């Protein structure tokens, strides 16, 4: 799994002009899934996401997590995070998971995050979405589970 996590003042996602999800202070999580991913990666990445200390404490140090600040999360599926443009100028997406597996793990990610009582909104898997956000910082963190030793 590969994710781009952005600390936001607000974020919202819409499809065909209809708002599907909207949050204020929290994290916008762009989530890419590859064919090698499983529930192990989901659990590890949810744990990392909810505990990532990228919110400022009273001394303006990034020392607080999403849970600490009672922030919200907006989760957006994004297969293009597995785009490879090393050869040519048109990205290849062969490293992205097939839709059935990707959707299943995407929904499990959302379910797992909600199990920690984190208010979670989501986009529509596979849809052409419009995402609007106001970065806070900006703070943007990229995490790839292949770089972790997940057992």
From Swiss-Prot:
Entries under InterPro entries matching the protein: Daa-tRNA_deacyls_DTD, DTD-like_sf
SUPFAM superfamilies: DTD-like (SSF69500)
EC nos: 3.1.1.96
Motif (Gly-cisPro motif, important for rejection of L-amino acids): 137-138
GO CC aspect terms: cytoplasm
Catalytic reaction list: glycyl-tRNA(Ala) + H2O = tRNA(Ala) + glycine + H(+); a D-aminoacyl-tRNA + H2O = a tRNA + a D-alpha-amino acid + H(+)
Stretches assigned to coiled coil: none
GO BP of this protein: D-amino acid catabolic process; tRNA metabolic process
Enzyme kind, highest EC tier: hydrolase
Entry keyword set: Cytoplasm, Hydrolase, RNA-binding, tRNA-binding
Pfam families the record matches: Tyr_Deacylase
Subcellular localization(s) per the UniProt record: Cytoplasm
Molecular function, one GO term: tRNA binding
Protein's UniProt keywords contain Hydrolase: yes
Protein's job: An aminoacyl-tRNA editing enzyme that deacylates mischarged D-aminoacyl-tRNAs. Also deacylates mischarged glycyl-tRNA(Ala), protecting cells against glycine mischarging by AlaRS. Acts via tRNA-based rather than protein-based catalysis; rejects L-amino acids rather than detecting D-amino acids in the active site. By recycling D-aminoacyl-tRNA to D-amino acids and free tRNA molecules, this enzyme counteracts the toxicity associated with the formation of D-aminoacyl-tRNA entities in vivo and helps enforce protein L-homochirality.
Subunit and interaction comment: Homodimer.
Family classification: Belongs to the DTD family.
PANTHER family registered for this protein in UniProt: D-AMINOACYL-TRNA DEACYLASE 1 (PTHR10472:SF5), D-TYROSYL-TRNA TYR DEACYLASE (PTHR10472)
Entry remark concerning the domains of this protein: A Gly-cisPro motif from one monomer fits into the active site of the other monomer to allow specific chiral rejection of L-amino acids.
Protein name: D-aminoacyl-tRNA deacylase
Organism: Fusobacterium nucleatum subsp. nucleatum (strain ATCC 25586 / DSM 15643 / BCRC 10681 / CIP 101130 / JCM 8532 / KCTC 2640 / LMG 13131 / VPI 4355)
